[in-house]
Amino acid sequence: MNLEGIKGQYDAIFSLGDLCLTSLQLKDNNLRTFSGILDWVSSPSLKNVNVLLQNRFADFLNLKNLRIIKYISEWDLLVWDEVYNIGFNHDFKTDKNTLTHLGGYAEVKEKYDRRIQRFLEKLSTSQRILFIRTEASFEEVAELEAILSGMIANDFRILIVNHTDVDHLVEKSWSLQRVCAIELPNHNKWNANNHYWKMILADITLL
């Protein structure tokens, strides 16, 4: 599928990682109306995200699976879910959490439980959903497509954005029915590709 195939109206758009780049671009292009589960976390492995989806988020953010890594700023603690290989950069604030005690855990868990419930409801009720993932292999995405096909009642599309050494937007020919895969320049990917994202998302709207 090419970029033309993902155009149109959607009931919901979700980022599936790997960082917050997708969420920032959705926000900048007025396509973000709520927070998703993977919006503000680090999820470096789509393989682990696939397991998370397949398990329908069972044991996600389970306290016994969390490892406190370090302070990453004056305000934030980095905490890692070692089962799903997901890092929380922005959720555990230093006014309530330390290197030895997550005093704000209950509040964070409640927030993510709400996001999970909304995500699963959208999968059941939406007519059309768009998922966007940065950094993924063909094999991982083929597995993702199969997992989502078993979870979603109606139609969906997946946009994969891999950052490589290309110097312009490149569409890839992946033989997956619901997937559009592209490559964007890796150099300064947080700021230098805004015009590409604007073009990619220009003909996508939320109902």
Model-derived segments and spans:
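Extracellular glycan-modifying ectodomains
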Residues: 1-207
